[in-house]
Amino acid sequence: TLGGGLGHTFTIVMFTQKFVDETGYTSLEEVIADRYPIKLITKKNGSLGELTAERVIEACGSSVEDFLSFATWEKTGTDAIKSGLQDDLYDMTIDHIDAGQATTTEICLTHDMYFVQLGDEALANMQTMGYAPIVMEAGTWNGQDTDINSMGSQQNVLVPASMDEELAYALTKAMCENKDEMAQAVASLGYFDPQTAGSAEMCGAPLHPGAIRYYEENG
């Protein structure tokens, strides 16, 4: 890789406000510990949202198999997720998205939702699974009044290990020294931080020698 952190995707866990009002639950860990028959709806198998939902459940101390022994889990398309939550047919959803994602934006504008804060232990467990800490800032969604500490997966620029070192150096330099221009083309790149782009936390593969040289020369 030439570096990571090109994006601002995060894990989002939401209960419907009706579920919170009727049950008193505000924590997924408590729901799982009490084996409450919660109704979860997410994207289909093979999506990052569905995979992240599995990881969240595991991070909260349950296997997916055990979770399904007391809860229900519908995996479907985004339109069905939206209508299912709006109609209170389901209690909860989990996804892995960026700010402004259309389905979540519409859900939060048309239905009262509760933004769930995962506990420190669950977040630490997700970090061991390859996710990186990220903050979902207050105001990201309608009705979200506080920051939510979350976990995201960082986008990387992957190149062949055989790439010429000078080319890798030049590409890394261009990426790190043109952040503003990149952000004008893709808004989420505004979160890219050249100071941390070469860190192990942001990179999902070994740094190319050309990238290493650039980061070492530039602190």
Protein language model regions, located:
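Extracellular/periplasmic catalytic domains that process cell-envelope and extracellular macromolecules
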Residues: 5-8, 33-35, 108-109, 149-152
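Structured segments of extracytoplasmic/periplasmic soluble domains
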Residues: 30, 34-37, 55-63, 84, ...
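Pocket-lining segment of extracytoplasmic ligand-binding domains
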Residues: 17-21, 62-163
